[in-house]
Amino acid sequence: MTSHIKVIYLEDKSAFAASIGNSLTERGFTTEVFNESAEQIEAIDGVVLFHENHNFDRHIAELRDLFDKRQVATHKIDMSGTMNVALSHLSLFFDRIKCKNVLFLGSENLKDNPKLEIFKEKWHL
């Protein structure tokens, strides 16, 4: 269950964030713009990285490294993999970590990935 999640942060002016943001809001999540402020970076206690075959944009890789150094729990979803497995593992991640402030990151090219639609349809947490 994800009732412990207070805020899901999404990057401003990101095609990936725009494509997933409405779906998160419709599911009752509070979303906020991630502006990389020190306050937000301190508050984030979970990161979900969406990718294809472990390919990350430079900016996404830099943010991943920043949160790795801060030892923030991170979960990766490979959009080229099986969505049922990805959704199951995401549920387990949230159940285990109980994070309250989560950052969702994804490369711009993922907005056109057909599996992103499957993810949005089947994510019933």
Language-model features, listed with the residues they occupy:
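Acidic/glycine-enriched connector segments
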Residues: 2-108, 112-123
